[in-house]
Amino acid sequence: MSKRKAIPKKVRQSVYLMYNGHCAYCGTEIAYKDMQVDHATPLRIGGADDIPNYMPACRSCNHYKATLDIEGFRDYLSRLHKRLMRDSIPYQVAERFGIVKYVSDDVKFYFEELRGGENGTME
């Protein structure tokens, strides 16, 4: 397996500015030094290694998205509540006492909110 080439600084800066220093997925503000460049369509399923396929991501979103495409990541996130209710007693207790509140399985990413619900990456 070949090692991936580093993304040039100017390209990283362009990716960072796509969403004004926010994670394209969750919308969290991220410091430039902490931004990870994600491939919206993973390389392993034919995604390109270029700017139209890059998304600025926080460490957490990049970790959990891993090699999923955007719809796969959406599906993963939409199932989290059921999984937490099944597997996490502290989560169950927190929900019972109103500390956390279940809102919806409908996952809308930050980049979609900015673009009026349109799926896909910046072009």
Give the location of each predicted region.
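Extended charged
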Residues: 1-10, 28-30, 55, 63-123
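Short, intrinsically disordered, charge-biased short linear motifs at domain edges
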Residues: 6-14, 41-48
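Short cysteine-rich loop/turn motifs with clustered Cys
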Residues: 7-35, 58
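Solvent-exposed, flexible loop/coil residues
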Residues: 34, 47, 113-115
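Activation segment
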Residues: 34, 44, 65-67
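Generic recognition of short, well-ordered alpha-helical segments
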Residues: 35, 49, 68-71
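Histidine-centered catalytic micro-motifs used for acid/base chemistry in nuclease
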Residues: 36-40
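Short beta-strand-alpha-helix junction that forms the catalytic/metal-binding core
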Residues: 45-64
